[in-house]
A protein has these predicted regions:
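Bacterial Sec-dependent N-terminal signal peptides
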Residues: 1-30, 139, 321-339
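Beta-barrel outer-membrane channel/assembly domains of diderm bacteria
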Residues: 24-98, 323-331, 338
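Short acidic/His/Gly/Ser-rich catalytic and metal-binding motifs that mark active-site loops
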Residues: 38-40, 113-117, 191-193
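Flexible, solvent-exposed loop segments that connect beta-strands
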Residues: 43-47, 120-122, 196-199
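Short, glycine/acidic-rich beta->alpha junctions
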Residues: 53, 85-87, 131, 164, ...
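Exposed, low-structure sequence patches enriched in small/polar residues
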Residues: 54, 92, 143-161, 167-339
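Subset of outer-membrane beta-barrel
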Residues: 62-68, 76, 87-103, 109-112, ...
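Surface-exposed coil loops of outer-membrane beta-barrel proteins
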Residues: 103-173, 184
């Protein structure tokens, strides 16, 4: 057993002893399965073509004193098809507070559902395969009209051999009838190694993006199950200290999503300057880009979600394609004790 897993086992053991001495608490469990097959044919655009196939399974135990305070402990296990052994096992341990519209997390907690609303231009979808957890804090507040969230994800702790890296984000939305105003902001900080004196070391980098969009949700006014149209502006910002100052390319971006009886069509169009966003989709480095998606959701039932998507990527002088199938299955139960 690795040192990392031994430490994790010790942490769970101490937590169980502590919980056992508490007054009556609710105990539960949940298991999340994520299977994915993503074939990317990007050669015509000069980007990296690859096939990503694998699965993740994430069992968790849940302890709760009441309806507001929750402690989760588990692991997230990745296996890529064709590999000899597991590529990655990461701990999932976090505290969650939920009450009166507030939702607070601290620890190592799943990014699914929390950052899923971020645009691919800012946070690419490959993160769902290889970085399932946020390591840090997240707070959000929401009601029918207003929602806002702020978070920090510590991606690398500074040591003698590793650089210090973290990302902070802010996002929100305000609704007024069918209209809405939404924003998304990120900043990634990449600093040097501890006690480093190497003159060839990459300088400190600050990189991020901000997007502001206005949209209209016409789902209730049409025969479709879902119809959403939005558009606005996006700017990226990047600097490499002592090398170059802030660079701020910008452009306009529009999104259309329509769904009817498990069949959907989505289109994203970007025009402007090439965006250099560290965690963003690399297609947006092109000054002109259009993404057309045609998809089908064959299985949708009680925690089971599946989706097949055929995507076409249009850049200047090139058309690439992508086929993606994902399946998520989440089950669980909380056993409530009488107090």
């Amino acid at each position: 057993m690795s040192i990392h897993l031994r430490r994790l086992s010790t942490l769970f053991f101490v937590a169980f002893l502590w919980i056992g001495n508490l007054p009556a608490q609710d105990i539960g469990w949940q298991i999340g399965f994520h299977g994915f097959a993503d074939n990317r044919e990007y050669a015509k655009s000069g980007l990296y073509s690859q096939s990503i196939l694998g699965m993740r399974i994430a069992p968790e135990l849940i302890f709760s004193m009441d309806s507001a305070h929750f402690l989760h402990g588990g692991v997230n296990f990745l296996h890529e098809f064709g590999s000899v052994a597991a590529k990655d096992v990461v701990p999932t341990v976090y505290y969650n507070y939920r009450q009166q519209g507030h939702d607070f997390y601290i620890g190592m907690f799943p990014r699914k559902d929390l950052l899923a609303g971020y645009h691919r231009a800012i946070l690419n979808d490959t993160l769902n395969y290889y970085r399932p957890n946020i390591e840090g804090l997240l707070w959000r507040y929401g009601n029918k009209i207003f929602r806002q969230q702020v978070w920090i994800d510590w991606t690398s702790r500074q040591t003698e051999t590793e650089r210090e890296q973290f990302m902070v984000g802010l996002s929100g939305r305000v609704n007024s009838g069918s209209l809405y105003l939404a924003h998304q902001i990120t900043l990634w900080h990449d600093a040097g190694k501890k006690n480093n004196t190497d003159e060839n070391e990459t300088p400190v980098r600050d990189n991020g993006a901000a997007m502001l969009k206005i949209g209209i949700d016409l789902s209730e006014l049409s025969f479709l199950d879902s119809l959403d149209i939005s558009g606005g502006g996006i700017v990226s910002y990047d600097r490499l200290r002592s090398i170059y100052d802030w660079r701020t390319p910008k452009g306009v971006i529009t999104d259309i999503y329509a769904e009817y009886r498990k069949i959907f069509i989505a289109n994203t169009f970007y025009a402007g300057e090439g965006l250099d966003i560290a965690y963003g989709d690399r297609f947006y480095t092109s000054g002109l880009y259009d993404r057309l998606e045609i998809g089908w959701k064959p299985l949708q039932y009680k925690g089971l979600e599946s989706q097949f998507t055929l995507s076409f990527h249009f850049t200047r002088g090139a058309v690439d394609n992508q086929q993606q199938f994902t399946l998520r299955y989440n089950i669980g139960k909380l056993y409530v004790t009488q107090r």
